[in-house]
Design a protein with these regions (language model features):
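Intrinsically disordered or compositionally simple regulatory linkers and C-terminal tails
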Residues: 122-125
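A short macromolecule-binding patch
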Residues: 1-2, 12
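Residue-level structural signal for beta-strand termini and adjacent loop
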Residues: 6, 13-14, 82
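Conserved beta-strand-loop-short alpha-helix elements that form
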Residues: 40-49, 56-85, 100, 104-106, ...
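Short acidic-glycine loop/turn motifs at beta-strand connectors
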Residues: 3-7, 119-120
């Protein structure tokens, strides 16, 4: 996800079985949220010595935050709550803790992983 100080924007897509079903029109995004096979991965890092990585270009401005997270986070909590946490917390470590706590409080039954990286400007920004 990319957080621009106001809202989170999904900048990747899941490599899951249900995402393939959604993309092919077999099921809706709403049906995918409760599909019994929603956690089946079609591609993942560490499953093979060779992986196919998706690449792209995203405008990343000074102050923007990239949020990498597992489905234990994004699959269990409201996106608006994540935006509220990122808007109100300037310390990234504390924001990670708060996001993790919120996902667990929302009932996540999966592992919860979150990494935040902030563009602090400077060379290469």
């Amino acid at each position: 996800y990319l957080f621009n100080g106001e809202s989170l924007k999904l900048i990747t897509r899941d490599h899951s079985f249900v995402e393939e079903l959604v993309r092919s029109g077999v099921i809706t995004r709403e049906q995918a949220e409760t599909h019994p096979q929603r956690n089946i991965l079609m591609r993942a890092v560490g499953t093979s010595p060779f992986i196919k990585a998706d690449t792209g270009i995203v405008e990343w401005k000074d102050g923007d935050i990239i949020m990498l997270c597992s489905d234990g986070l994004h699959g269990s909590m409201n996106i608006r709550l994540a935006e509220e946490i990122l808007s109100s917390e300037s310390n990234l470590l504390t924001a990670c803790d708060r996001l993790t706590d919120a996902a667990l409080a929302a009932g996540s039954s999966d592992n919860v992983t979150v990494v935040l990286v902030k563009n602090a400007g400077g060379i290469g920004a």
